From Swiss-Prot:
GO terms for cellular component: extracellular region. This is Contryphan Li1044/Li965. Keywords: Amidation, Bromination, Disulfide bond, Ion channel impairing toxin, Secreted, Toxin. The cysteine framework is C-C.
Length: 8
């Protein structure tokens, strides 16, 4: 998931 990450 790209909700809590910054390196999607």
């Amino acid at each position: 998931g790209c909700e809590w990450v910054s390196w999607c």
